[in-house]
Amino acid sequence: VKKEDVNFTNLSQKKTSSTRKELVLLIPFNASKTPTDIKKDAFLNISLDYYSGVLMAIDSAKTLGLNIDVKIFDSQESKMSSDVANIVRVNNLKNADAVIGPFYQQYVEQVAEMLNASKVPVISPLSKETGKTFDNLYQTIPPNHVTKDIVFDYMKGNNANIIAVISPKKV
């Protein structure tokens, strides 16, 4: 992916109609885990933080006058398994206006493949990975090199100075 191939859209200025939209969220709460597992589950903390942000975004969307119905499903994700295929089939997600999630790229691709014929946009919320491509699959996080190029171009264009703070753990 080249920087010039990346499109950015300000969705707050792109309100197209007043018709009600159905948004589906696939979030790995993994609610079937035992309470002792949940207490030490870092992945659950990520899911809950993400969910908190989603609730704020929904509130902002409604403030902007967007009519949305939101359905939230526990995708029961781990690196080895998920419930996304079952959720898509049982809940007839081919009629959704958009699906956000799941978290792991392999399951995002699975959902995108299942909904590709219906042209339902599937949005990968957290993954930077790129694997299989589908016309209905959208990555929300650009690749590192695109982000770096855009930041450097901005800094060059504004004669900005660069101060680097580097953690030896993540070099």
Whereabouts are the PLM-identified features?
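Extracytoplasmic/secreted proteins, especially bacterial periplasmic and envelope-associated proteins
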Residues: D49, G53-M56, S82-N86, Q106, ...
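Pro/Ala/Gly-rich low-complexity, hydrophilic intrinsically disordered segments
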Residues: V1-I27, A31
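Signal peptide-proximal N-terminal region
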Residues: L44-V70
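Short, solvent-exposed loop/turn elements at domain surfaces
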Residues: A31-D37
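Beta-alpha junction/loop-to-helix N-cap segments that form part of ligand/metal-binding clefts
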Residues: L64-T130
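Extracytoplasmic ligand/sensor domains, especially the bilobed periplasmic-binding protein
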Residues: I100-V171
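Residue-level signal for short, function-critical loop segments
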Residues: F29-A31, Q76, K169
